[in-house]
Amino acid sequence: MMREKVVVGLSGGVDSSVAAFLLKQQGYDVIGVTMLMWAPDGTEPQSVTDARKVAEHLDIPYYVLDFTKQFKKEVVDYFVGEYLAGRTPNPCNVCNRRIKWEALIAWAGEQGAQYIATGHYARIDRLANGRYAICNSATAQKDQTYALYNLTQEQLAHTLLPIGDYSKEEIRRIAAEQKLPVANKSDSQDICFIPDGDYGAFLERQVPDKIPGEGNFVLTDGTVIGRHKGVTHYTIGQRKGLGIAMGHPVFVCEIRPETNEVVIGENEDIFSCNLICDEVNYMGMEEGKEQRRCMAKVRYAHKGDVCTLEKQSDGKMKVHFEKPVRAITPGQAVVFYDGEYVLGGGIIQTAEK
């Protein structure tokens, strides 16, 4: 009997390594792959070195696929463009759908593989309406459903998420028991192409001729109160690093790239009850015109708030929260939930009182 073949995306970390082990243990014919996304100096990243060691340890075939050109076009250029437009993007969401899933599923199909798999802390379920949906991992502290909201039904049908039923502690224990070479490797925290976390410096290296220079800090009534370093250095809700002394805490409540202004306000000024999102992906719910009540998260660490969804005539979605939500940020994703299931989500365009 032919074993089902699965291509596992090996990041060089402990989660994807244990995912590969678990799938092999379950009887799958496992192929390990590292997708090379960002290697500006031309040297082999440590992630590739580590993933290769894991594949050798597990005795599975291993390949490195060069997606650097596609990553630059689909993710890095998008990231830069969003910041220049005064928004705060989430490049991981774009990368997940367009590269880690779309491109990897295409390659897997060429190898005769039925599935791809990753080390994300989430699960996939099939709902009563016949649709696939991402649902919360077994341990809420490592839940990664927010980053996967925009996967398509076709992608979900060909995806396995083997560590969604485990806690991080259990994954570490399995890695140690199996003597995986990355068992003690720490988790990565930053955006992979900006490991030092300095977005401003990265943007200046990428598009030095397009970076806006200094501009005015203004109050909500238009009063100029100081100078800022350039709109790409700020995000909605930011309090630290503003370099202005008002005698009390103040926050970034709006970014205006067209006038190179950063609007400063009080804490209450960064709360909103409404947002408009576009690029809506329907996952657990089908596209429909009727209003729907659910929970929504406006950032990865947001626990979620009750809201009503209302599809607009132009295909965008209006999200009305029952109570004001802090720092709704254009460019970030808003993700809709029904209990533990992801209904869908979109990219925040505007926030309104």
Residue spans for each PLM region:
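AMP-forming adenylation/ATP pyrophosphatase catalytic core
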Residues: 117-128, 133-353
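ATP-dependent adenylation/nucleotidyltransferase module used to activate substrates
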Residues: 1-149, 160, 169-170, 176
